[in-house]
Amino acid sequence: MNPLVFTMIMSTVMLGTAIVATSSHWLMAWIGFEMNMLAVIPILMKKYNPRSMEASTKYFLTQATASMLLMLAVTMNLVYSGQWSITKPLNPTASTIMTLAMAMKLGLSPFHFWVPEVTQGISLPSGLILLTWQKLAPMSILYQISPPINLDLLMMLINLSIAIGGWGGLNQTQLRKIMAYSSIAHMGWMTAILTYNPTMTLLNLMIYILLTTTTFMMFMLSSTTTTLSLSHTWNKMPLLTTAILLTMLSLGGLPPLSGFMPKWMIIQELTKNNSVIMPTTMAVMALLNLYFYMRLTYSTSLTMFPSTNNMKMKWQFNYTKSTTHLSPLIILSTLILPLSPMLALLE
């Protein structure tokens, strides 16, 4: 893709998200969503092949349906209340439809089917944008409408997302699909705390984006897309492979890594609000995510895939790509748990 065209497209993607996050008028928010969606489709089709075409078509249809539901909710709210302001509480029916529209845009279950398929059909850089930046705009709308959201509907979306995010990743060998199912589960965790402590939702979102960005950048550096190719990287790039596995365990929420902190804070906040069954169920279902990351770590680091190579470890590395920019990301992805007492300043 021409660098000038790519710069224009990326600027439009960022501008669309910024419009959604900063607008106080529902029509402007809808325009921001449409700008973002139409600009991100060429990024998904950057590598022109049938799989990316199929993935971008699925993404377009899903996002267009969600935008239609958004306009339905806004129009219904306009009929009942006569106002377009995002800051004013929505009508209960409009709030429910809006929640479903944002759930479809985020990929929350039962609207999750597009996420693994689209992520698998596109390149790693496009997948990184899809699973990180594209979550900001819908999450900002949910953040703004969070007080009057239907709690029963929200609990159903949360439980289904965390369960599907765990079950779906169990039988996968494609790393992009594993990351997609992990994204579904993380979106469930973020939504769980939305009505109790929206600030913690933003903290969880930032840590999720940090971990996912680090993981995808290491996948790009090692050209790894499957569990088999990941198992073959340890004798070429042992340090990078170790960092990949540690970051993935952090994504699964294994203490004492960084990914454990948001789960710990969310469970603590839910129990403070006299909710015991919900965090217990979420913690048990999160073990599914941790299991497939542990299994991936075990198969990569402690077992040997069949190989014709007699000498397993190379004595000379010819790896020339710079990894300097990864150092701060890897440190933040694995070692920020000791900083958690500083979160008391947010309260």
From Swiss-Prot:
It catalyses: a ubiquinone + NADH + 5 H(+)(in) = a ubiquinol + NAD(+) + 4 H(+)(out). Pfam families: NADH_dehy_S2_C, Proton_antipo_M. It is found in: Mitochondrion inner membrane. Signal peptide: none annotated. One of its GO terms (molecular function) is NADH dehydrogenase (ubiquinone) activity. One of its GO terms (biological process) is mitochondrial electron transport, NADH to ubiquinone. GO terms for cellular component: mitochondrial inner membrane. It is a multi-pass membrane protein. The chain crosses the membrane at residues 1-21, 25-45, 59-79, 111-131, 149-169, 178-198, 201-221, 237-257, 274-294, 326-346. Keywords: Electron transport, Membrane, Mitochondrion, Mitochondrion inner membrane, NAD, Respiratory chain, Translocase, Transmembrane, Transmembrane helix, Transport, Ubiquinone. Its EC number is 7.1.1.2. The keyword Transcription does not apply. Belongs to the complex I subunit 2 family. Core subunit of the mitochondrial membrane respiratory chain NADH dehydrogenase (Complex I) which catalyzes electron transfer from NADH through the respiratory chain, using ubiquinone as an electron acceptor. Essential for the catalytic activity and assembly of complex I. Core subunit of respiratory chain NADH dehydrogenase (Complex I) which is composed of 45 different subunits. Interacts with TMEM242. This is NADH-ubiquinone oxidoreductase chain 2. The lineage of its organism: Eukaryota, Metazoa, Chordata, Craniata, Vertebrata. The gene is MT-ND2.
